[in-house]
């Protein structure tokens, strides 16, 4: 089964082509540039380099969020368009799970972190069991301090991954102490090949109803934060 994996949910642009579990080719850049101008050319270049025609693809896998609203939307739109035009299945995979997958050899919990501003993060909790990535706590948007207090109750150490971890390292260590392990650079970037493997057995989405998973705040909470920002602005 030839799978094309697409990840534009962070400023990492990743495209991978796999034949089952076997990686054929992979394209990754960590540039803060517009994915809308670069994603399709990257896909075209990868397919040509690997001498694979679009008609030979069996499945599309896309990082469905959370992450950059614009970035996630670009990837999902491209993936839906390709899947529809080629009449092949599309599977969406958590962008956080894709980052967690890079830490497959860590024996305990994995918490990928995307910054959501004002002390908040997008995160979830994962671990590997018999080589398979398992979701322990679903992806969510919450205050990092609250998340760390929640993790403090766990019986194992937690590996924090993702490029935004360094923005929050001080809070993580302050709350969790030695239970927190800050990942090395090798586990911070999402790899589209990991995304593709995660999506191999993922269920197919309904192309008409499939939308990005932005993990928006509950309306009441969002309004409260907006009101607080207004108060800060008047007194700033």
Outline where the language-model segments fall.
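Glycine-rich phosphate-binding loop signature in dinucleotide/nucleotide-binding domains
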Residues: 50-55, 106, 152-156, 202-203
């Amino acid at each position: 089964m030839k799978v094309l994996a697409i990840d534009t949910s962070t400023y990492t642009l990743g495209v991978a082509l796999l034949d089952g579990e076997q990686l054929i080719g992979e394209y990754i850049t960590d540039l803060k540039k517009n994915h809308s101008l670069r994603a399709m050319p990257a896909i075209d270049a990868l397919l040509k380099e690997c001498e694979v025609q679009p008609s030979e693809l069996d499945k599309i896998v896309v990082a469905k969020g959370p992450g950059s609203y614009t970035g996630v939307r670009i990837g999902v739109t491209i993936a839906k368009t390709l899947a529809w035009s080629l009449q092949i299945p599309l599977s969406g995979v958590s962008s956080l799970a894709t980052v967690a997958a890079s830490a497959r050899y860590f024996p305990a919990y994995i918490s990928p972190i995307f910054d959501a501003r004002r002390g908040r993060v997008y995160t979830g909790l994962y671990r590997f069991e018999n080589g398979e990535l398992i979701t322990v706590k679903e992806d969510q948007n919450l205050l990092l301090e609250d998340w760390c207090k929640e993790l403090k109750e766990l019986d194992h150490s937690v590996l924090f991954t993702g490029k935004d971890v360094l923005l929050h390292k001080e809070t993580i260590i302050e709350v969790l102490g030695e239970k927190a392990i800050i990942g090395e650079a090798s586990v911070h970037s999402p790899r589209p090949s990991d995304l593709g493997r995660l999506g191999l057995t993922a269920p197919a989405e309904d192309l008409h109803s499939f939308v990005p998973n932005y993990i928006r705040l509950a309306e009441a909470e969002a309004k409260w934060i907006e009101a607080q920002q207004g108060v800060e602005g008047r007194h700033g």
